Amino acid sequence: MNKQMLLLILLCICIGCISNKSESDLLNKKNPIGIYGNFSSTEKIQNIVDLISNKDVLINKEVKVRGLVNEVCPMRGCWLEVVDENGIDKLRIKVTDGDIVFPLSAKGRNIEAEGQFSILTLNKQQAKNWKKHLAAEKGIEIDTSEIILSQNDYFEYRLNTTGAKIF
């Protein structure tokens, strides 16, 4: 009986391992519609313009935002750039690498996401390194000495996300 039980446990483990999708499978998922992470439908939804306009009040607070996915991290699906309906104001939705994998097919889709709102402030060298890193994720090599920064390159609005709904 112990051998049968052990065999059953091993079989369950093997089936569980086989059915888990790899990070690559999740990144290349054809249909992005769905819930990612822990997402609730109870909080008031902010648009990105209002969030940024009220940043002094909302900084480090839990918020829920709605926008349009403009870009997806091509390496691990660990961030999304989301724009408001005006297409100008943007927010980076960031998750812990591997906790949630947003598919590349999410680009152009609507999203609601919740998490802690923050502002990442960068000095000149950090801003250049960040731009170099973002380019490298796309397979583009650039020399930091050739990067020209704008005022907007010294900070980034972020939502450290615990859950999202893509629709």
What positions do the PLM features span?
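OB-fold and OB-like single-stranded nucleic-acid-recognition modules
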Residues: 17-167
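Bacterial Sec-dependent N-terminal signal peptides
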Residues: 1-27
